[in-house]
Amino acid sequence: MEFIGEEMVNDAFNYWLEKNGFEARVFGLENAFAWNPYSDLIYYSVVMSEQADIMFYEYVDELGLKYEIDNFWLAFLHELGHSETWCFVEEEDYDIPKNITNYDYYRLPREAVATEWAVRFINEHADLVRDLTRIVGPVIDKFFELNEIER
């Protein structure tokens, strides 16, 4: 399915990334948030699992998140965290065991490092996170409106 306005969302994300000196870029919409280590591209999703969101947010709270933040932004910053920390993670840490629970998945070394980076970034750079939501937020809202997607 093709969505109206996907390119404007990508452009808004990439503007913020470039403005703040990040090398990663946003490529587009997928079924889930993801980061590709070979291309350093981030994919975002408009479909979020409510149960997974709750469990992820509980995990993030354990890490000492100081600010309340929507899971969409948290998921994006987690993927950016993969880009920023990939050199600290061993290749075998990218292996995912079969039938893993969300609880255990969040604690895999590569996932934990990316989430810890995101939490630290949010806690230490609240101004940049506000800037992210100010720049990309209205574009995401317009994207949802154009595609008649409920939030």
List each language-model region with its residue ranges:
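Alpha-helix capping at helix-to-loop junctions
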Residues: H82, W86-E90, R120-D127
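A structural signal for well-ordered alpha-helical segments within the folded catalytic domains
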Residues: E7, D70-L74, H78, A112-E116, ...
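Short intrinsically disordered terminal tails
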Residues: M1, F88-E90, I149-R151
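Post-HEXXH active-site segment of zinc metalloproteases
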Residues: D70, W86-E116
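Zn2+-dependent metallopeptidase catalytic core
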Residues: I4-G21
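Long, well-structured alpha-helical subdomains associated
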Residues: N102-P109, E116-R151
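Active-site scaffold of zinc-dependent metalloenzymes
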Residues: R25-D70, L80, W86-C87
